């Protein structure tokens, strides 16, 4: 997002705004993706759910579940990362822990927060079709189902 502002030698305020927009849009998109990996389905996602878990990726839903979990639950997540033993049955257990602690909802809440920050960063720009398109891009990123 910031490249166009740099090329056109925009004001520092505009460069900073577009930097903030791009950063927060990216975070919002990724957080939504992290949540969808545990709540989506193959038909809507175009990929199997649980891929992040099965690949050993430590995403926010897992981090929050780990932090909130008891010793046994923490050990479960540690073993998944350290021992690299992951399968569909263990995924079901991970989802149960994640759901118990409400980490999907909290991850989505963070996505919405970053989406709001991204939109707020655009406040310095006049209302145009281009700004509107960027605002819709934020909306799509946080309400998407795939």
Feature-to-residue mapping (PLM):
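All-alpha prenyltransferase/terpene-synthase fold signal
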Residues: 1-146
């Amino acid at each position: 997002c910031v490249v166009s502002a740099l090329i056109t030698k925009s004001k520092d305020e505009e460069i900073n705004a577009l930097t903030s927009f791009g950063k927060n849009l990216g975070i919002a998109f990724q957080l939504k993706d992290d949540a969808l990996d545990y709540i989506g389905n193959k038909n809507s996602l175009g990929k199997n759910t649980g891929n992040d878990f099965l690949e050993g990726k430590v995403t926010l839903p897992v981090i929050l579940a780990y932090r909130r979990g008891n010793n046994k639950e923490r050990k479960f997540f540690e073993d998944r990362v350290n021992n690299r033993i992951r399968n569909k049955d263990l995924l079901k257990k991970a989802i149960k822990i994640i759901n118990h602690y409400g980490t999907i909802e909290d991850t989505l809440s963070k996505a919405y927060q970053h989406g709001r920050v991204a939109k707020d960063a655009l406040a310095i720009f006049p209302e145009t079709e281009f700004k509107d398109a960027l605002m819709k891009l934020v909306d799509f990123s946080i309400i998407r189902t795939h």
